[in-house]
Every structure is written in structure tokens, then in C-alpha cells.
Amino acid sequence: MKTTLKMTALAALSAFVLAGCGSHQMKSEGHANMQLQQQAVLGLNWMQDSGEYKALAYQAYNAAKVAFDHAKVAKGKKKAVVADLDETMLDNSPYAGWQVQNNKPFDGKDWTRWVDARQSRAVPGAVEFNNYVNSHNGKVFYVTNRKDSTEKSGTIDDMKRLGFNGVEESAFYLKKDKSAKAARFAEIEKQGYEIVLYVGDNLDDFGNTVYGKLNADRRAFVDQNQGKFGKTFIMLPNANYGGWEGGLAEGYFKKDTQGQIKARLDAVQAWDGK
């Protein structure tokens, strides 16, 4: 009987300890999520509130218009522009604000709810550029990693509401399986188009060369192609997220929250104070 009581007490104690450990781990992970989201606040402030962000967006689209006007295509080819959507033509910063206020990491289901809410804003200059191209012997194609299966209708509705023209379903190349975009670019070219401009907020919007690569490779790509920026590649500012975040460390997006925080801090280049 005593042995049974001891075993029961030991089991109860073990369950209590394990429950306590689980609770501690949940609290620790919750704190880490809060820390990760709070690190995004200043960048979000910049994108939502600064004149500098708006100026850079207008600057990018002004350059895009000049580049489009000067671009020539081979005989028999049609002129095309491929554009990313999120943080390129569509401003989703209110979703990022919701993440900050609720200490929420990115979640695909939450993102789809945001798309369904149809509350995206237009990036400054995007509507005007889009409509200019579509009315001057060009065609804008939207190559985005929004999901083809669940996020197409919300996206099209939002863009119509915001004043984008040319947003018929055939202009959209959403994600079906792979995030890398080169295969979708090739599909557009097979229709007799020549892509004269790539517009995006992420180097991965310009092809697969540095897709999934570390930032050293991404910086090298920029240096090697410096003459194309403002002419063939139009880059929009995005301080909130992108391929550069995954480029901070090998396997960054497979790390837990604490690991991602450490990778961010490890990447900081700092003065030693001397």
C-alpha cells in the first residue's frame, strides 16, 4: 500500500513538474513572439508614417515610367511589365500592425483572412504607373505569392476598388506550388510578350538567382547588376519582411522564435565604442 501511495505521489509530482515546464515554455515562447514583433515597430512606423517612405515609392514609380517609355522590344513582341503585389503595388502594413498589437508571427490562415477582408491600400505611385502602362501599348502582369486557390478573388476585388485597371483574371500569376517566380515569367514570355521591367520589393521578384540564398549572395547579385536598377529592375522599399530576412542565417525560417531573434542580433554590425 505504501509503495502504491509513493508511486501515485511521484506520478502526481511528475505531472505537476511537466505541466509547470510546459507552462514555462509557452510563456517563454509567447515572450519571444512579443519580442520578435516589437522589433518590427520602428520599420513599420517608417513605412506608415514617414514622408521618406512615400518619396522612395514615388521615386521608384517615376523611374519605372521613364524606363518603360524608353524600353524597346523585338519585332513581333508585345511589351510587358511584371510586378509583385505585396509591398510593391499593395500596402499591407495594417496587417503588420495587427501582428505587432497581438504579438502574432506570420500565419498563412491569418494572412488569408486579411486578404479576404479586402482592406489593402495602394503603394504611392502604383495605381498611376499600372494604368499608364496598360494604356500605352503595354501590359502589367501580377506575379505574386498570394495563393491562387484561396486569395485570388479578394486580391482582384481590392485592386479594382483601389483604381487599378487591367486586373482581369488572366493578368494574375499567383502561387500554385512554388514561391520562386522564374517559371511564371517564362509562361508570360510564351504568350509573345517581352518583359521590359521587373517591379518588386524583394530581389526574388527579379528571378531565381538568389532565391533562398544568404545575404552575402544577395548583396553580390546587386553589385553585379547595379546598372539594371532603375532601368530593368525597379525596387520598392520594404523594411518589414522579405527574402533578406531569411538571408540573415542558414535555415532562418526553420529556427524557433528564440533562434530567429539570435540570428537578427548576430547579424548586427556594431561599433566597439573605442
From Swiss-Prot:
Keyword field contains Lipoprotein: yes
Places the protein is found: Cell outer membrane
Signal sequence extent: 1-20
CDD domains per the UniProt record, alphabetical: HAD_CAP
Gene3D superfamilies in the record: HAD superfamily/HAD-like (3.40.50.1000)
Membrane topology: Lipid-anchor
Record protein name field: Lipoprotein E
